[in-house]
């Protein structure tokens, strides 16, 4: 099989839907390569590929209660999928609703995720849960 035999957009959507939204960690064993190059800031990178993705799923689901990720834009170019998604739910400590954007770039090889860059808007998350001071009024 070669890369043209796989629907990389569908593989990405399965990671989002089954993994992040439903909490099904087995998706990582199915779709991740044993060696995953992870470039997301603060991500654990010293584990086998599936364990890296499982850690990210657990972290996201513990950081945002009732997590729903909605893919709003998605583009495929060759072996790479680029997506902008909205993550919604609530802060588990305060119960405050949260809504942030996440940018993902995933490279696949023969149906396996081999490289990932992730940019969740952590600044927006911290602001929404009150961990950062409120924005000052205009003109000050």
Protein language model features and the residues they cover:
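Conserved hydrophobic/aromatic beta-strand scaffold that supports enzyme active sites
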Residues: 82-84, 103-105
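A solvent-exposed, acidic/Ser-Thr-rich amphipathic alpha-helical stretch
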Residues: 25-81
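Short, surface-exposed coil-to-beta transition loops
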Residues: 68-69, 98-103
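Short, acidic, Ser/Thr-enriched surface-loop or helix-capping motifs
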Residues: 92, 108
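Short, low-complexity N-terminal intrinsically disordered segments enriched in polar/charged residues
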Residues: 1-34, 134-140
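Generic short beta-strand segments
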Residues: 84-90
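Low-complexity, intrinsically disordered terminal/linker segments enriched in charged
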Residues: 115-140
